[in-house]
């Protein structure tokens, strides 16, 4: 059966849900898709269709980032339901790096919890520019004053992580009660159910408060590979977020990083089960590649316009070392330290060879709160360019965040 074409009629925005485990992120995602199905041809998704990994169902927690799509009157959204559990922050780094804005879900019954704060810190580090807050489980809070206190605490927490706490819209509601109402009657109209109306109000705020991102469509094409599938009879598909530029079917691309660079032709493009002639920056797309075996391409590689980006192993970077209050290390580290470097969709072990202080003198160690330059050598080559951002992590915690300043090798 031929796939229908994806029609680009509305502005496309990538958003996601972040927040503490069990505060209701996936339930909210399901409620939003069902609530908005009248604006698009897409069917709403039930909770169990979003919560997809078997391990999640067993533990009732979300691990892999699940992509769903929905539309409001003005926009087309791709929505990432982000992991809510400490061990899965790794996926948040690769999943959240793709958000133009996020909905922070906080339980009105609990208020901000440790992971709420960890996700806010990560959102700041990976550059999620704007947030809207959904204060969930409002039905479980009997006293309106308690809810006001929680809202106040949320605003203070946002301020602490350098988000404008006074300005960010906070909408209270119950994702579960809205979802139950929508399952009972999928055609609920605005004004018929107070809980469904609160979801609509949330999405109106997302529409107006999260700005439409300026896409870098005039630059050369680059997409980090997030996943690889093989389709019988058609070949290998690499999926990911187009970071910049545009790509048409029939174009030549290079596959770069982790092993030798290869060149191939794009034989097809797909987004949300529909075909495209051209993909642009900001799309979550599947790229069908001619003559590439599934084993020859993996997560962490990039597809790029030929000759535009090269694999490197050694660079100098400007780095900020997190304080322990921000979730960083409690002790300093020295040259020779070998943490993980998270870049786009991959993590690679690297050795930190030397530090330089701001004044140009050699620093003997890096302690929390430092801003310094460091020379890093990775154990595998990946696509690196000046201005590229990365996170440094070790044993489940983020140690630092940096930007490549000079490529050395």
Curated annotation (Swiss-Prot):
Region G2: which residues? 60-64
| Record organism | Tupiella akineta (Green alga)
State what protein this is by name.
Answer: Elongation factor Tu, chloroplastic
Which Gene3D superfamilies would you find in this protein's record?
P-loop containing nucleotide triphosphate hydrolases (3.40.50.300), Translation factors (2.40.30.10)
Q: Name one GO molecular function term.
A: GTPase activity
Q: Does the keyword Cytoplasm apply?
A: no
Fetch the CDD domains from UniProt. EF_Tu (cd01884), EFTU_II (cd03697), EFTU_III (cd03707)
Single Gene Ontology BP annotation: mitochondrial translational elongation
Pfam families annotated for this entry?
GTP_EFTU (PF00009), GTP_EFTU_D2 (PF03144), GTP_EFTU_D3 (PF03143)
